[in-house]
Regions:
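N-terminal accessory beta-strand-rich subdomains and adjacent acidic, glycine-rich linkers
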Residues: 1-219
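Conserved, mostly hydrophobic/aromatic
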Residues: 53, 268, 343, 370, ...
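An acidic-aromatic substrate-binding cleft motif
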Residues: 188, 192-267, 271
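Aromatic- and carboxylate-enriched substrate-binding clefts and catalytic-loop regions
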Residues: 278-453
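Acidic/polar loop patches that form or flank catalytic/metal-binding clefts of enzymes
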Residues: 369-374, 399-401, 467-478, 495-499, ...
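Glycan-recognition and catalytic regions of carbohydrate-active enzymes
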Residues: 473-520, 524, 556-560
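Carbohydrate-binding surface patches
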Residues: 504-541, 545, 585-586
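C-terminal beta-strand-rich structural cap/linker in extracellular carbohydrate-active enzymes
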Residues: 566-592
Length: 592
């Protein structure tokens, strides 16, 4: 050991495009310098701790591995997002077949000692100790380094596992848009001179509600590297893929064509939506991204949208984008496109995390947003490059289109905000107007439905963090549901203040958020009906008008049943709201 340095941080940091406008960054820090050419840094916060290694050499270093053990008391339990089965095989490489996957799965609750030691878990992962502590483990500031998986190494111990650096990558997967690793190097990373490694971050709290409102990952991320962020506009988007371009009652054939996209633009403009996402199908082919399909005239659509205050975001596969990133960004930025939704990355090795930062930098130079799908969890790039506006890495609403009927999306909805969302925002793509109770749910790709009630879908716009948020259903569906549409379209996507009023992992969550002088509250339950007491004492003193959407009297049988009420209440009062099984509620609160 060469030197030990203690330090304190205590500052309020502006947080644009986030769940609060200011983040309190207060911690005790410890930096330990070693003679062997590296340092180890610790930070201790009120709601967590983190550590990271720092290279102190002036040379590149090859790392063959990293030890990251996490030891827990006997009797601890875990809420685990296992990787899904994958077809890749790599003889002699433990877990090699599990490194390529989409980071989308439901959670498995288990005792730590019974966790499947043959399967990796992706992060974040939650452990509960017998003493009542909650420990949520994730990465932060993951740049030019592989992401961490966890495996059970002993009855009471988890250990980090890291994908080796790819040696040979070939085009494969869906229409050859994915980079499939056929051969790995015998090391996990090449570290540049004086590079800082990612933080190993652990939220440490005593109740579930604190998990859903921690700022730990955002605090640990590198500060913004863009001089000008005034061009970055969060907001909502009309989106066609989930609903299958499902317009009806119109005088043209709906599909991937000019008339359909003009209709989506008109719908977005009429309802104050900032964007239309043009998903898979707009181009002449996945590997022909400079050409459009059918009669689509993209410059004309850009102009049509610009006249109405609506921007366009284009979907594109990972390899077609990575192979000609500069040319695509230059071409479509000049045309007036506002961003790309990049899909099918499905890895988090060093080369892929390098790609994410290169894409963020390149897109920012051309004034373009990025919405990353088929991607690992957020680790802070959204602070460093805030044009990276949202992430998938979530078992989102698209899953109900094809998952087995037994899939439990409702329980996932009240688990994910405490675990996955502690890492950052989620492009869950909510907003279904076809809703089903448990016994009526079926996966239907062409005309999909959600699990749970209509009000649950409304609540998700308040509960889920999403600076770019989709309206997943067809305009024709929303136009029949004017009250719900008006509420959804009006919910902000970034906030001045966020408070989780009530929460229990896997059972319920109630979140209050403020934008300016207006408050929104959203609540959801699992499959168990419950009564939520909405205590309004979080509001400043005074009288308030409350617009409330609550499950209807028959929502237990007919999930789309809801009631809208307008109430006048004092901040000293409370309100009991009954939630049906799989139910929810949403409220808008303004000063009377």
């Amino acid at each position: 050991m060469k030197r030990v340095q203690h330090y304190l941080l205590d500052e309020q940091v502006p947080a644009p495009f986030y769940k609060r406008s200011q983040v309190a960054d207060r911690c005790n820090g410890l930096l330990v310098e070693f003679r062997e050419g590296f340092a180890l840094e610790f930070r201790l916060y009120d709601d967590g701790m983190a550590y990271r290694f720092l290279s102190r050499t002036d040379d590149e270093v090859t790392l063959r591995g990293e030890r990251a053990p996490f030891l827990f008391p006997e009797g601890s339990t875990a809420v685990v997002p296992y990787v899904r089965d994958t077809p890749q095989q790599h003889e002699g490489l433990p877990f090699g077949e599990q490194f390529m996957q989409s980071f989308e799965n439901t959670y498995t609750e288990t005792s730590l000692s019974a966790m499947d030691s043959t399967r990796l878990a992706f992060l974040p992962l939650l452990v509960r100790t017998p003493g009542g502590e909650r420990v949520c483990i994730t990465d932060a500031d993951l740049e030019s380094y592989p992401g961490m998986f966890l495996r059970r190494a002993a009855a009471d111990r988890l250990e980090g596992v890291f994908a080796p650096c790819p040696r040979r990558i070939v085009a494969g997967g869906y229409d050859r848009m994915q980079g499939v690793v056929e051969e790995y190097e015998p090391y996990i990373a090449r570290i540049a001179a004086r590079q800082t490694l990612p933080w190993r971050a652990m939220a440490l709290v005593r109740n579930d509600a604190e998990l859903a409102q921690t700022d730990l990952v955002w605090r640990l991320a590198s500060p913004c590297r863009l001089d000008d962020i005034s061009w970055i506009e969060p907001g909502k988007a009309a989106w066609e893929w989930w609903n299958g371009w499902g317009l009806y009652g119109v005088d043209f054939e709906a599909g991937i064509n000019q008339r359909t996209y003009e209709y989506y633009i008109d719908f977005a403009a009429a309802n104050g939506l900032r964007y239309v996402v043009m998903d898979d199908g707009w181009s002449a082919g996945h590997h022909r991204p400079f050409e459009t399909a059918g009669d689509i005239d993209l410059p004309a659509l850009v102009a049509y949208g610009a006249e109405r205050g609506v921007g366009l975001i284009l979907w594109i596969g990972y390899l077609p984008f990575a192979g000609q990133m500069e040319e695509l960004c230059a071409h479509y930025s000049k045309m007036g496109i506002r961003g790309f939704k990049v899909d099918f990355m499905d890895r988090d090795d060093q080369l892929l995390t390098d790609f994410v930062y290169e894409a963020a930098r390149t897109a920012a130079r051309y004034g373009l947003l990025l919405d990353l799908h088929g991607i690992y969890k957020p680790t802070g790039v959204q602070r460093t490059y805030p044009n990276v506006i949202n992430f998938e890495g979530v078992h989102g609403l698209e899953q109900v289109k094809w998952s087995p009927v037994e899939v439990d999306q409702v329980t996932y909805d009240v688990t994910m905000p405490f675990i996955r969302m502690m890492a950052g925002p989620v492009d869950y793509t909510q907003g279904a107007m076809r809703n089903a109770v448990r016994e009526n749910f079926r996966p239907v790709n062409g005309e999909p439905m959600s699990q749970g009630t209509r009000c649950r879908q409304l609540a998700q716009y308040v509960v889920f963090d999403a600076p770019l948020s989709m309206l997943c259903d067809a305009p024709s569906q929303y136009e029949r549901e004017e009250e719900c549409l008006r509420f959804i379209a009006g919910v902000p996507t970034v906030w001045d203040q966020t408070r989780v009023l009530e929460g229990e992992v896997g059972h319920c969550i109630v979140t209050a958020r403020r934008s300016g002088e207006v408050w929104y509250v959203g609540g959801m339950t699992g499959w168990k009906a419950r009564t939520v007491h909405l205590d309004l004492s979080f509001l400043p003193e005074g009288t308030y008008d409350v617009e409330l959407f609550r499950d209807g009297a028959n929502a237990r049988r007919i999930a789309r049943d809801y009631r809208r009420e307008v109430l006048t209440l004092d901040a000293s009062e409370g309100l009991d709201v009954e939630l049906a099984p799989g139910g929810g509620f949403a409220a808008r609160i303004v000063k009377h």
